[in-house]
From Swiss-Prot, chain A:
GO terms for molecular function: metallopeptidase activity; translation initiation factor activity; translation initiation factor binding. It comes from the Eukaryota. It is found in: Cytoplasm. The gene is eIF3f2. Keywords: Cytoplasm, Initiation factor, Protein biosynthesis. HAMAP family: eIF3f. Belongs to the eIF-3 subunit F family. Pfam families: JAB, MitMem_reg. Its main location: cytoplasm. It comes from Drosophila willistoni. This is Eukaryotic translation initiation factor 3 subunit F-2. CDD domains: MPN_eIF3f. One of its GO terms (biological process) is formation of cytoplasmic translation initiation complex.
Swiss-Prot record, chain B:
This is Eukaryotic translation initiation factor 3 subunit H. Keywords: Cytoplasm, Initiation factor, Protein biosynthesis. The keyword Cytoplasm applies. Pfam families: eIF3h_C, JAB. Its main location: cytoplasm. The gene is eIF-3p40. Signal peptide: none annotated. GO terms for molecular function: metallopeptidase activity; translation initiation factor activity.
Amino acid sequence: MQAEFKLRSKILLQPLVLLHIIDAYERRPKDCTQVIGTLLGRNNPESGHLEISNCFTLLHKDYPNSDRIDVDLQYANDMYELNQLTYPQEKIIGWYATGKEVSRSAVNLHEYYARECADGNPMHLLIDTSLRGQRMMMRLYTAVVMGVPNGTKGLMFSLLPVEMSSGNPESVALNLMKKNALQPTKQVGRILPELVQVVDITRDLQTKLDLVLRYVNETLARKRTPNNTVGRALHDALTSVPLVDAESFRMMFNANVRDMLMSITLATMIKAQLKISESVIAMPDL
Amino acid sequence: MANRGGRHARTEETENAINYVQCDGLAVMKMVKHCHEESNNMDLAQGALLGLVVDKCLEITNCFPFPKSGDETMDEEMYQLTVMRRLRRVNVDHLHVGWYQSSDVGNSLSLALLESQYHYQTSIEESVVVVYDTQKSSRGFLCLKAYRLTPQAIQMYKDGDFTPEAFRNLKVGYESLFAEIPIVIKNSPLTNIMMSELNELLPEDKGHNFLDLGTASVLENHMRSLIERVDELYQEAVRYNKYQQVVFKQDTEKHRALAKLAAENAVRTSKGEPTVSEEEVIKQFRPMPVPARLTATITSGQINTHAQHIAQFCSQSLAKLFITESLQNAKEAKEIK
């Protein structure tokens, strides 16, 4: 069992799953302190790593200070089947829960998911929504059997390394949300026009350049001890700008600018034409 | 001026239902995932939006995908009901507030979309359609747009009358078929905390590919679909012109016949014979069916959005080009030194 996890060196986690868990936590029933649910995943065709790509919440009732937990299994099955209709490639790979630590009911849940899981080796994602230590902790566990051979055996939940995975489009959406989360402005959550996005990133670039410039100047003025790694990284960045000879760059630049201006003109003309044609048709009969 | 005043009044009418759409991050991510997965299979992704209406704001808090349309054996309504019932049990908002669809630029505002949205809006008044542009988003610009049909468009579709007169009377034009509703993405504080945790885990360089300079192919695609649409509109225009010619010809013939009749009648009255009524003649000329304006209007709308997209795209490309220029200049200046 353990050998398998070593081969499967990386487990990727899609941010969608985290968003889902937090949403579920915020919508939990009044008398519930935690939420649990099934994790669904598949093999990422690009990287070959296992990817946790989806999840759904379960109805359950937990009893504090005991390992008893009641889960609506019928509901779990129904949800899985409904998900199969839209994402047939996603299989059950484990479960998630919120809480400070692995709960006492985890052993029971592990048994259930070991039956449901294709490889009999479910994973357990734990999210600390109580924000202990001012952080939101996310951990992925797998249960390892331990104990004396032919004797008492128990389960130990050991940590698995996990990495965030997100395809490009997801990152685009995430970047936007991140910006809103980190610097709440007046226009919260507006989807910005393209030009504004480019302007924004240019501004970002400028602040970064200022930072680098300050660093370089300080180093030159012997105020800061030089760091070889930083120096090399800077050198790499500088040399990564390809040198195009002036003539061909002009050519490229001019051709592109011409194309763009032409397109804008055309687009504007077409818009004007549309307006005219509609007005002509809508003209009342004389 | 009168036209502008009219449009203002119209926007007020639509504002009565919903001012803006507030979308949860979860719903956005779910849509992004579903649409891109389907676009890998070259399919159109569609799904339902769940949420609630607060004052004049439509909150989209969750969504679920529709199963692939190829499966005919499944009852789609049944599926939707089951999913909603299941989600309701875990306290997800179960008000069906609209639907989403993946699409590429501009082509989204089609007749099919108008029809479906008409059915949605007549059954649930507040519903919206969210269009997610996969192509644009994979180039680094998140492109989510919410649309609703304007009251005039609904009236027009309800009457089923697509003649130019009906369009004129209802003041429907290509710009007033669909009303775009601004979308705002909002996350709960707990999600925002999670986002800042994610900030450390996610690679920095992802999602910035909108600085890509290779614009020719994109522009080409835009142009190609624009040309297609313009061709379609041209066909419609030709049809309309033909109709006008036929009507004109018929009119002249009618006038001639009427003049002839009047002359004959004058002769008849002078002879004291009974006159032939004009209606007899008019009956011979049956009025021509007026070509419907709906397709042309929708195509115009599509062309309009295409043109807007192209203008937007070009302006940001120009900005990027000028950034590169300054880089190049700096490099050249260094070379000279």
